[in-house]
From Swiss-Prot:
Family: Belongs to the potassium channel KCNN family. KCa2.2/KCNN2 subfamily.
Subunit note: Homodimer. Heteromultimer with KCNN1 and KCNN3. The complex is composed of 4 channel subunits each of which binds to a calmodulin subunit which regulates the channel activity through calcium-binding. Interacts (via N-terminal domain) with MPP2.
The protein's role, per its UniProt record: Small conductance calcium-activated potassium channel that mediates the voltage-independent transmembrane transfer of potassium across the cell membrane through a constitutive interaction with calmodulin which binds the intracellular calcium allowing its opening. The current is characterized by a voltage-independent activation, an intracellular calcium concentration increase-dependent activation and a single-channel conductance of about 3 picosiemens.
GO molecular function: calmodulin binding; monoatomic ion channel activity; small conductance calcium-activated potassium channel activity
Compartments, record wording: Membrane; Cytoplasm, Myofibril, Sarcomere, Z line
Keyword terms, alphabetized: Calmodulin-binding, Cytoplasm, Ion channel, Ion transport, Membrane, Phosphoprotein, Transmembrane, Transmembrane helix, Transport
Compositional bias per record (Low complexity), positions renumbered to this chain: 198-212, 219-235, 313-326, 828-839
TM stretches of this protein: 398-418, 428-448, 474-494, 516-536, 565-585, 634-654
Protein name: Small conductance calcium-activated potassium channel protein 2
Record-linked InterPro entries: CaM-bd_dom (IPR004178), CaM-bd_dom_sf (IPR036122), K_chnl_Ca-activ_SK (IPR015449), K_chnl_dom (IPR013099)
Record remark: domains: The calmodulin-binding domain (CaMBD) forms an elongated dimer with a calmodulin molecule bound at each end; each calmodulin wraps around three alpha-helices, two from one CaMBD subunit and one from the other.
Chain positions covered by the region annotation Calmodulin-binding: 672-748
Membrane topology: Multi-pass membrane protein
């Protein structure tokens, strides 16, 4: 079914009855490029909820009480008893819109004149398109465009064309006031296939046509607010026959507590039975939605609009609906059910829309063809891991059935030799059991190789399985099937076996069973043990080890796993292999020799074990010799295996006796200390003997030649001892410089060189910084003369201006002073003479 992913964002805002935003995002309301839907008076109904609750809906769209706090809850007004019961049974209405008269109570509001869409005082909403045949035909072009989009930029649910909706309009609110506007730019309609199917089953076909959004339905049906999906005629509802089951079903759902802000952003339309799931990680929503958008397929509901007057379809309305229906893109469905197609193609009256069914079939084939092409790396890794687990499980089952067949074969062979013959029913039953286990084993092997081919296709991106079928793979598959198919056939079949006895060389002829030829090759099934060990190895299943191995070009196969086991626990591996080979070879020699061994020498199990042991160890006493070529061949293989195991034992013992690195370092340190002491002692002996020789030859009156020769011999011995100790010390130093120590020294030198390189790079960076600073300083120095000259000129200009101002002041002062002196002289000349002057 199609999956619609919606990412909740902070862009979700409340909407009041006029379409204006409330809350923290109200300032974005004016910037929204999407138009608003204007509801006219004809689409207003009594107050009813629009909570799209359903039992199969994951995130229903519910409007809590108080979602529009600016409007007081209006009193319930309805002309029918059903409307009053519906209003009383709802605990949490979606939006308390003001009640207005119903269209069918006021025909002058519901039915308008054809062709008067342009002169209408209000814009016609989507719900008014199907009020009648004339109105639907004429008002199809007058409907306002409804844009459906999600909050994410690369959403997987969007409309590709913005066209008017006539018959298939989805109303987000089923009631409003006169002249109210509702912005649906942030809302996505929601519809449910299950609720629609229940409504189609419950509502009978009727000729009376009501408005799709105005019919009062039970609260559990989402079509009361959504209308029809364009797949049939509008449903007629009888107000005087309320269904009690609807109220009982709505009561537990209406009490569901939810956040209106989150639900508005996360609610989406489940077209064709789709399921909405919110994204768990917001950081990956853009990438996921873009991937889904590349695989999206358009789903268009068929244009089946039925007008009034007995349910006759209107051609003009159907044409307008088919031409103007929005193309809604839904994510790629995994399974297209016939019920989902029938939801769009079948109407309430039984009419089927062929266009919807054809569109669904085309989208189904398109999605199936593009499913494998658009698989991302996450899907491939998950599919590859699942194939790994299945292959490991198949290998385990194959080993179980293979070992079961071997055990039953051994039991049947031993019982038929001592308890009963091959013609008994017990032997037949055991052989039938062996055959059954062999058939199951062959089936498991075939399925195992099929899984390997699927893994090859996933790893190499191949589309056809024939690409993986190389001649080498086909040969090994056929060889494996042939090896596992060998088993004793039910029935008693014999042949004549002739051999020559060991010591008497007399011919021996006897009648042997064919089962001996078919039983011994069953031990070849033990190769399944190596496969199981490989698939269960930590080196093979761990992703980190496989990544490191791939970087180092290491192939993780059975050989590599056996090498690691021989490195980790060589003694255990050799012990298990030797004991298993010993027991199997001894039983095989017993089964081969029992038809020609009259003295019961090699046909005895203990005697056969002795023969295999001395052959395995390459001793060969000669007291026991096989008579048949079968026994001789088993002894030959045992001798070869014994030589190899003996060499491995010697290598393992030598490795165990070898000193470890720490032990070598301790041993070298102790030997170096001892050699240092010996060098000191030898040097002291040389000095002592030299002194004694000097004393006995120079400091005595009578020279004792015997004593002098004795000290000379000791002196020569001390020199020789000193030289030998120094040679041993030099050899010890050479032995200490092993490959591991050289590697360690190389690592130390590499670290030193790396440190020097880092220091040189740091030094170069500092030099570059210093050069940059020097260049800046040189530029500043070059610009200094200009700055100095400019400063001098400015200071000179200021000085001149100051001097000019002082000069002007001085001149004005002198002029003022001269004027004042002349004024005083003039006043003194014009003054009358005094009495003293006159006398």
């Amino acid at each position: 079914m199609p999956i619609v992913l919606v990412r909740p964002t902070n862009r979700t805002r409340r909407l009041d009855s006029t379409g204006a935003g409330m809350g923290p995002s109200s300032h974005q309301q004016q910037e929204s490029p999407l138009p608003t839907i204007t509801h006219c008076a004809g689409c207003t109904t009594a107050w009813s909820p629009c909570s799209f609750n359903s039992s199969d809906m994951e995130t229903p769209l519910q409007f809590q009480r108080g979602f529009f706090p600016e409007q007081p809850p209006p009193p319930p007004r309805s002309s029918h008893l059903h409307c009053q019961q519906q209003q009383q049974s709802q605990d949490k209405p979606c939006a308390p819109f003001a009640p207005l008269p119903h269209p069918h109570h006021h025909p002058h509001l519901a039915h308008q004149q054809p062709g008067s869409g342009g002169s209408s005082p209000c814009l016609r909403c989507n719900s008014c398109a199907s009020s009648g045949a004339p109105a639907a035909g004429a008002g199809a072009g007058d409907n306002l465009s409804l844009l459906l989009r999600t909050s994410s930029p690369g959403g997987a649910f969007r409309t590709r064309t913005s066209s008017p909706l006539s018959g298939s309009s989805c109303c987000c609110c089923c009631s409003s006031r006169r002249g109210s506007q509702l912005n649906v730019s942030e809302l996505t309609p929601s519809s449910h296939a299950s609720a629609l199917r229940q409504q189609y089953a419950q509502q009978p076909a009727s000729a009376s046509q009501y408005h799709q959004c105005h019919s009062l339905q039970p609260a559990t049906s989402p079509t009361g607010s959504l209308g029809s999906l364009g797949s049939g005629p509008p449903l007629s509802h009888h107000h005087h026959h309320p269904h009690p089951a609807h109220h009982q079903h709505h009561q537990p759902q209406a009490r569901r507590e939810s956040n209106p802000f989150t639900e508005i952003a996360m609610s989406s339309c489940r077209y064709n039975g789709g399921v909405m799931r919110p994204l768990s990680n917001l950081s990956s929503s853009r990438r996921n939605l873009q991937e889904m958008d590349s695989e999206a397929q358009p789903l268009q509901p068929p244009a089946s609009v039925v007008g009034g007057g007995g349910g006759a379809s209107s051609p003009s309305a159907a044409a307008a609906a088919s031409s103007s229906a929005p193309e809604i893109v839904v994510s790629k469905p995994e399974h297209n059910n016939s019920n989902n197609l029938a939801l769009y193609g079948t109407g309430g009256g039984g009419s089927t829309g062929g266009g919807g069914g054809g569109s669904g079939h085309g989208s189904s084939s398109g999605t199936k063809s593009s499913k494998k092409k658009n698989q991302n790396i996450g899907y491939k890794l998950g599919h590859r891991r699942a194939l790994f687990e299945k292959r490991k499980r198949l290998s385990d089952y194959a080993l179980i059935f293979g070992m079961f067949g071997i055990v039953v074969m051994v039991i049947e062979t031993e019982l038929s030799w001592g308890a009963y013959d091959k013609a008994s029913l017990y032997s037949l039953a055991l052989k039938c059991l062996i055959s059954l286990s062999t058939i199951i084993l062959l089936g498991l092997i075939i399925v195992y190789h099929a899984r390997e081919i699927q893994l090859f296709m996933v790893d190499n991106g191949a589309d056809d399985w024939r690409i993986a079928m190389t001649y080498e793979r086909i040969f090994f598959i056929c060889l494996e099937i042939l090896v596992c198919a060998i088993h004793p056939i039910p029935g008693n079949y014999t042949f004549t076996w002739t051999a020559r006895l060991a010591f008497s060389y007399a011919p021996s002829t006897t009648t042997a069973d064919v089962d001996i030829i078919l039983s011994i090759p069953m031990f070849l099934r033990l190769y399944l043990i190596a496969r199981v060990m490989l698939l269960h190895s930590k080196l093979f299943t761990d992703a980190s080890s496989r990544s490191i191995g791939a970087l180092n070009k290491i192939n993780f196969n059975t050989r590599f796993v056996m090498k690691t086991l021989m490195t980790i626990c060589p003694g255990t591996v050799l012990l298990v292999f030797s004991i298993s080979l010993w027991i199997i070879a001894a039983w095989t020699v017993r089964a081969c020799e029992r038809y020609h061994d009259q003295q019961d020498v090699t046909s005895n199990f203990l005697g056969a074990m002795w023969l295999i042991s001395i052959t395995f160890l390459s001793i060969g006493y000669g007291d026991m010799v096989p008579n048949t070529y079968c026994g001789k061949g088993v002894c030959l293989l045992t001798g070869i295996m014994g030589a190899g195991c003996t060499a491995l034992v010697v290598a393992v013992v030598a490795r165990k006796l070898e000193l470890t690195k720490a032990e070598k370092h301790v041993h070298n340190f102790m030997m170096d200390t001892q050699l240092t002491k010996r060098v000191k002692n030898a040097a002291a002996n040389v000095l002592r003997e030299t002194w004694l020789i000097y004393k006995n030859t120079k400091l005595v009156k009578k020279i004792d030649h015997a004593k002098v020769r004795k000290h000379q011999r000791k002196f020569l011995q001390a020199i020789h001892q000193l030289r030998s100790v120094k040679m041993e010390q030099r050899k010890l130093n050479d032995q200490a410089n092993t490959l591991v120590d050289l590697a360690k020294t190389q690592n130390i030198m590499y670290d030193m060189i790396s440190d020097l390189n880092e220091r040189s790079e740091d030094f170069e960076k500092r030099i570059v910084t210093l050069e940059t600073k020097l260049e800046t300083l040189i530029g500043s120095i070059h610009a200094l003369p200009g700055l100095i000259s400019q400063t001098i000129r400015q200071q000179q200009r200021d000085f001149i201006e100051t001097q000019m101002e002082n000069y002007d002041k001085h001149v004005s002062y002198n002029a003022e002073r001269s004027r004042s002196s002349s004024r005083r002289r003039r006043s003194s000349s014009t003054a009358p003479p005094t009495s003293s002057e006159s006398s």
